[in-house]
């Protein structure tokens, strides 16, 4: 997803171990990548390891600059609301996404995907003029977090009601899809067994 950031990301590839140590390979990769990408660790895994399917959970964080607070240095890494947001409504609606729900209204579907997924936890926090919305689960659909945040922003702008979100999560109706901007989204953590 273009402009989405990752603080944690796993990549699987094969190489001839006898030619390079893990430390040498890490050094070479870090010199090859742009400064925005940095290899922090190399771990040997089974040949059939899949970074996408073998994880036990992923945590996404969406950054929003609080209304009335603009930090230009973070403008490419966060969402800046263009109108008033009712923060209390966002706090109220965020826990609605926890649990097992039908998320087809919160995704761009690409074929025969399982849209009945579980969000293990959500959280809201504020720090230094920033709002942090976190979503933790084993699997997410394409653009799911951006559509969930879009629904929260729509609710915070009084464009939709709580029942609209609940009906969409129950698969009863298609929510008017509003996809949040990509630059506020971070893949914050991936956990493996």
Segments from the language model and where they lie:
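Structured-RNA-binding interfaces characteristic of tRNA pseudouridine synthases
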Residues: 2-193
């Amino acid at each position: 997803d273009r402009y989405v950031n990752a603080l944690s990301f796993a990549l699987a590839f094969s190489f001839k171990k006898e030619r390079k140590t893990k430390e040498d390979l890490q050094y070479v990769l870090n010199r090859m990548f742009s400064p925005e990408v940095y290899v922090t660790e190399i771990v040997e895994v089974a040949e059939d390891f899949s970074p996408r399917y073998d994880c036990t959970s992923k945590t996404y964080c969406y950054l929003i600059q609080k209304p009335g607070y603009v930090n230009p240095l973070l403008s490419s890494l966060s969402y800046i609301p263009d109108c008033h947001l009712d923060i209390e409504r966002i706090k109220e609606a965020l826990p609605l996404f926890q649990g097992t729900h039908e998320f087809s209204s919160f995704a761009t579907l690409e074929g025969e995907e399982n849209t009945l997924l579980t969000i293990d936890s959500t959280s809201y926090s504020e720090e230094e003029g920033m709002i942090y919305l976190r979503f933790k689960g084993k699997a997410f659909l394409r653009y799911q977090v951006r559509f969930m945040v879009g629904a929260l922003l729509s609710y915070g702008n009084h464009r939709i009601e709580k029942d609209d979100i609940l009906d969409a999560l129950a698969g009863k109706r298609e929510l008017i899809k509003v996809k949040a901007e990509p630059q506020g989204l971070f893949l914050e953590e991936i956990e493996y067994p």
